[in-house]
Amino acid sequence: MHSILAVDDSASMRQMVSFTLKNAGYDVVEAVDGEDAFDKARVRDFDLVLTDQNMPRLDGLGLTRRLREHPKFRATPILILTTESSDEMKQAGRAAGATGWLVKPFDPAKLIEVIQKVVR
């Protein structure tokens, strides 16, 4: 079973993502922001990090950069969830080391489809 760290400061979004992923057979650990996610990632291995972009304390790009600085996370896929679909956001995500991104709102089936491609 693949393990996913789901990061979002919105409780309702976190619950929806977690519910969707658990129903698809994934093991899910939730984090409320980038700092919380980084703390959890240091003590447990994940097959994928799924993070919101706009969060207090440490946003998705900051979390991605911080994770990529450590050898343990260099190959871990990181998907960013964002309301921004601009080329600038995509470039910033790539520069930070993100594997990909999904624009909110998104279809839960599309989320599963993207994750299945990434964690093969």
Model-derived segments and spans:
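Active-site residues of response regulator receiver
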Residues: 52, 82
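Conserved acidic segment of CheY-like receiver
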Residues: 2-12, 17-21, 49
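C-terminal output helix
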Residues: 106-115
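Receiver (REC) domain active-site loop signature in two-component systems and cognate sites
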Residues: 55
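Short hydrophobic/Thr-rich beta-strand motif most characteristic of the beta2 strand and flanking loop
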Residues: 25-32, 40
